[in-house]
């Protein structure tokens, strides 16, 4: 029996009104492995985290389609049955590029992606000063993604994101999302929700359509827990800074300690073997043994 793809699995979950998807933000293979090890059933590949980890730059439209697709593919293939929702920015161009983005993400194993209505020189949705394309251009992007998905008979989930709230206000944001829904988008995403009351209102105003909540702590949106989002009626919640925020703090403290004391001072359990086990060491050793290899017959523990 063929394996159900991650995209199909996510689509089936969205068709089940009782299902609720919590996706922590990950930005590289290590953060993805840690999230999977914690038991999450979906992941979110953050564009901000990708820009920071791949390029060392802020989320200002630095990443190309190739950057994002390669990172999304690597993360998706760590656990091919686990849905990965990936940032796809503006689709990286006009309708032809949006279609190409859709096709490449789908063939890379990505389960879902979101496309927004900022200009190509975009910025993080929780920064001020955003500039939007007109609604017709936005809808063209969504339509191009939906039609590309249909052409290749893919189940990849198309998420329509609008950044209009901070620029044009709530009513135009809802109008844009309705237009995206009419163009075939599977899920709606209002970026930068500013209150819990607004969160409840958008669910009411777009009733019957699955909605995603973006929970960026200390950004434009007040703290909303996964349980609260579920009770409000959202179907997906993502936490883009769930990994990169704590990683920054931990690495900063370790570097300061190394600079000050001449050694990072890692805890005793932080051995190479432990870190490699997070990254599939035991599974790789099993593959070698089952194929008749002898590379790991003696194990990998140091003899002291």
Question: What does each model-found stretch correspond to?
Answer:
Residues 258-304:
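Flexible C-terminal active-site loop/helix
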Residues 2-239, 245-249, 253-256, 290-304:
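Alpha/beta enzyme core
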């Amino acid at each position: 029996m063929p394996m159900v793809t991650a995209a199909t699995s996510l689509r089936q979950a969205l068709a089940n009104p009782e299902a609720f998807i919590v996706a922590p933000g990950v930005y590289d293979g290590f953060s993805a492995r840690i999230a999977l090890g914690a038991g999450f059933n979906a992941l979110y590949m953050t564009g901000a985290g990708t820009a920071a980890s791949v390029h060392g730059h802020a989320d200002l439209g630095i990443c190309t389609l190739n950057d994002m697709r390669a990172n999304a593919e690597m993360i998706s293939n760590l656990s091919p049955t686990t849905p990965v929702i990936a940032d796809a920015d503006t689709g990286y161009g006009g309708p032809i590029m949006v279609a190409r983005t859709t096709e490449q993400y789908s063939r890379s194993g990505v389960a879902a992606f979101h496309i927004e209505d900022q200009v190509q020189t975009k910025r993080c949705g929780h920064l001020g000063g955003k500039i939007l394309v007109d609604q017709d251009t936005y809808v063209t992007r969504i339509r191009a993604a939906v039609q590309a998905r249909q052409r290749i008979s893919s189940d990849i989930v198309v998420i329509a994101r609008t950044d209009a709230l901070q620029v044009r206000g709530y009513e135009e944001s809802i109008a844009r999302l309705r237009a995206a829904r009419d163009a075939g988008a599977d899920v709606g995403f209002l970026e930068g929700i500013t209150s819990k009351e607004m969160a409840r209102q958008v669910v009411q105003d777009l009733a019957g359509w699955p909605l995603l909540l973006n929970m960026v702590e200390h950004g434009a949106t007040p703290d909303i827990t996964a349980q609260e989002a579920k009770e409000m009626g959202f179907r997906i919640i993502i936490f883009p800074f769930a990994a990169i925020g704590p990683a920054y703090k931990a690495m900063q403290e370790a570097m300061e300690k190394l600079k000050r004391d001449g050694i990072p001072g890692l805890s005793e359990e932080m051995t190479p073997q432990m870190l490699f086990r997070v990254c599939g060491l035991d599974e790789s050793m099993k593959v070698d043994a089952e194929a008749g290899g002898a590379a790991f017959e003696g194990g990998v523990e140091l003899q002291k």
